[in-house]
């Protein structure tokens, strides 16, 4: 959720909405028509789904925008659905080991978000550069950018892995872990931090595929990684069949095996190049300081953007940890379920980012803007339905994962309160991805600093501790902060400076 900039409606100065019978509808803003969306005819929808799953070679800078978004978004959404299924299954199995095991996962992942942030920042840079080169019809330049991104990710992973393995127990202690959590969680944390290369490479290579428009390949990579993870997880956690019962440590081992396999498969597709737009050849395998420096500059603000957003979760977790393991466990369960809804939405957002990058590369900024509003509308429809379900069915959903009376109420509160902002999140997630796809990573970075650190964390502490709202104060702060970020993002997006960014 960090880094998204949710918004429920376009800016308030629009004058009306005109519907057409095509695959789009138009929103009249200050006398200018901006296409938003209207679901395509059912026949066209299913043919688009088939095209998307097969792996389309279409030119996303030409033709109907609705069709292009559909073909890009379907594999991205299915990719994220699989990631969501893994997130829920993982916490489902770990929850059977007790609240301390769930708290271990929650605390470890709150620190892993820093690694995710680096991976996201590098992925933002890789997607923007590859998409722009593909839009310019420079496939050789796209391959060169891909090699520099992978090299940068590998070097980063080595440094982070060494630090994480050595410092894991101290890091958990700084996060407020209890003695029991430290006893069972230190090995889990070491394995997860040491295996961070699988996270970085999986993020990066799939970002390259998405930027190129090869969303179906990225989908297959993540499905493979998570299928292995889901199958192997319970075997290593509970000792099924010939496998040893490793407890929470088994979950970490299964995760790294699954992600590592996916990363190797993805790299093989880049090198083989049989069906991918980006084909890495032998002459590309060299460091190019000029290309890498452009990538570093682009990724640095993207990484900072993600770090600011995800690191603020650590501040929220620190506040929640003062209320005990039950609160942490409930929050972890609730957030994992929320991820189930938001990750598919990130699929739609990624589709919008790819459309923006390629359209700007083809010198079609109006097409880029139309694609963003259309993707946002689809996202709003989806998250609106999911938000209602979470509010109404929060307790039955929480009971799927645990019946512990010390945990369930906090999971229910997490689901209900954060889901209230889903309509806001919908457009904002797409807007945030659009800025990044255009290479304008600094705008979301500044917004994240203001909203998450100067607004959300102080507000969370005020509500939870000073005004005695308890954990609910933290959940409210999340929803309020994202709503604020949404409105600010919409204003800046309308100004259109992102259209002039060079990558």
Sequence positions of predicted segments:
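Transmembrane helical elements of multi-pass membrane transporters/channels
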Residues: 70-90, 191, 225, 258-262, ...
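Short alpha-helical transmembrane segments in multi-pass integral membrane proteins
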Residues: 7-73, 130-197, 231, 243-300, ...
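Short runs within selected transmembrane alpha-helices of multi-pass transporters and secretion channels
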Residues: 123, 192-210, 218-226, 251-267, ...
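N-terminal transmembrane alpha-helices
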Residues: 56, 60-92, 96-97, 110-125, ...
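Interfacial/gating helices of multi-pass transporter permease domains
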Residues: 71, 93-113, 179-187, 248-249, ...
């Amino acid at each position: 959720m960090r880094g998204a900039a949710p918004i429920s409606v376009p800016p308030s100065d629009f004058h009306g909405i005109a519907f057409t019978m095509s695959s789009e509808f138009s929103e009249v803003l200050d006398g200018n028509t901006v296409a938003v969306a209207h679901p395509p005819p059912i026949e066209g929808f299913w043919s688009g789904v088939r095209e998307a799953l097969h792996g389309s070679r279409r030119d996303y800078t030409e033709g109907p925008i609705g069709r292009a978004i559909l073909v890009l978004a379907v594999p991205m959404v299915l990719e994220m659905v699989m990631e969501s299924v893994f997130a829920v299954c993982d916490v489902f199995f770990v929850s059977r080991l007790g609240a301390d095991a769930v708290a271990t996962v929650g605390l470890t992942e709150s620190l892993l978000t820093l690694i995710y942030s680096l991976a996201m920042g590098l992925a933002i840079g890789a997607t923007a550069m590859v998409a722009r080169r593909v839009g310019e019809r420079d496939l050789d330049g796209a391959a060169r950018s891909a090699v520099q991104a992978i090299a940068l990710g590998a070097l980063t992973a080595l440094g982070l892995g060494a630090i994480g393995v050595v410092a894991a127990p101290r890091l958990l202690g700084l996060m407020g872990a209890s003695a029991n959590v430290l006893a069972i969680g230190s090995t889990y944390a070491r394995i997860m931090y040491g295996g961070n290369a699988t996270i970085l490479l999986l993020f990066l290579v799939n970002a390259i595929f998405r930027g190129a428009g090869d969303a179906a390949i990225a989908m297959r990579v993540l499905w493979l990684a998570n299928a292995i993870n889901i199958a192997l997880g319970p075997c290593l956690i509970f000792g099924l069949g010939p496998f040893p019962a490793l407890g929470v440590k088994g979950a970490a081992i299964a995760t790294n095996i699954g992600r590592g396999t996916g990363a190797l498969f993805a790299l093989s597709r880049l090198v083989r190049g049989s069906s991918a737009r980006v084909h890495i050849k032998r002459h590309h395998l060299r460091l190019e300081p000029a290309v890498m420096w452009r990538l570093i500059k682009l990724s640095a603000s993207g990484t900072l953007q993600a770090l600011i957003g995800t690191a603020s979760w650590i501040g929220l977790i620190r506040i929640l940890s003062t209320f005990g393991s039950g609160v942490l466990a409930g929050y972890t369960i609730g957030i994992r379920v929320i991820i189930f809804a938001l990750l598919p939405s990130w699929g739609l957002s990624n589709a919008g980012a790819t459309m923006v990058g390629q359209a700007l590369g083809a010198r079609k900024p109006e097409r880029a803007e139309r694609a963003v509003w259309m993707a946002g509308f689809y996202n709003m429809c989806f998250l609106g339905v999911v938000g209602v379900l979470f509010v109404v069915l929060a307790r039955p959903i929480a009971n799927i994962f645990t019946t512990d009376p010390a945990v369930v109420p906090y999971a229910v509160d997490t689901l209900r309160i954060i889901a209230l902002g889903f309509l806001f999140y919908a457009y904002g997630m797409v807007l945030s991805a659009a800025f990044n796809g255009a290479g304008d990573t600094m705008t979301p970075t500044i917004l994240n600093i203001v909203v998450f650190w100067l607004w959300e964390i102080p507000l969370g502490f005020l509500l939870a501790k000073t005004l005695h709202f308890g954990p609910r104060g933290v959940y409210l702060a999340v929803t309020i902060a994202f709503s604020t970020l949404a409105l600010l993002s919409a204003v800046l997006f309308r100004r259109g400076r992102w259209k002039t960014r060079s990558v």
